[in-house]
Amino acid sequence: MLIHRIEIVFTSSRDAPLRVRTFLNELTYVFPNSIKINRGRQSLKDIIAKSIYLNSKYLVIIDVIKGNPGRFRVYDLTSKMLKYNFIIYGVTLLTELKLHRTLIKRGCIGKIEDQKIKNMLIDLGYIYIENCDVYANGDYIIKDNNYVFELKFTKDDKILGPVIRFQLYDRNKNIN
């Protein structure tokens, strides 16, 4: 039996509500070679140990703010450092759009205006080639008088993953 290598582990802050768990499920569909670990009451140290045991490169933690996805943190498990830290301004889930999930085998970068988001997508396995299952596209928009970055996962103008709106935020932090 062939088992693919796990590159990315997705998890949430403790005891995440249904909307955040659904968001995590949808992320595992649009990021190739990724899995979701239910955090429950496990410590961050336990989640990091499981991620390292799975030989994954990155751990993505979705923090909860007022019952919704609130922060998108990407840890590099080689250096054990926080690599990306974005505030999530809002998400639109596929279930809210009444669309079905499609498992993505190869993701490509389309038009992305923000360099930090582009670098994060490259680190999380998205590449620059022509023929892909999904393309990550994004641009700055004004939403509720705020300047945010909207990221969409699409192919042929069909949305294949959650729509994520980021307020860009960055800070180095060690996870030890």
UniProtKB/Swiss-Prot annotation:
InterPro entries in alphabetical order: Brix, Brix_dom_Rbsml_bgen_prot
Molecular-function GO terms, alphabetical: rRNA binding
Alphabetically ordered keywords of this record: Ribosome biogenesis
Taxonomic superkingdom: Archaea
Leader sequence segment: none
GO biological process, one term: rRNA processing
Domain Brix positions: 6-176
HAMAP family in the cross-refs: BriX (MF_00699)
Biological role stated in the UniProt entry: Probably involved in the biogenesis of the ribosome.
Name listed for the protein in its UniProt record: Probable Brix domain-containing ribosomal biogenesis protein
Annotated source species: Sulfurisphaera tokodaii (strain DSM 16993 / JCM 10545 / NBRC 100140 / 7) (Sulfolobus tokodaii)
Lineage: Archaea, Thermoproteota, Thermoprotei, Sulfolobales, Sulfolobaceae
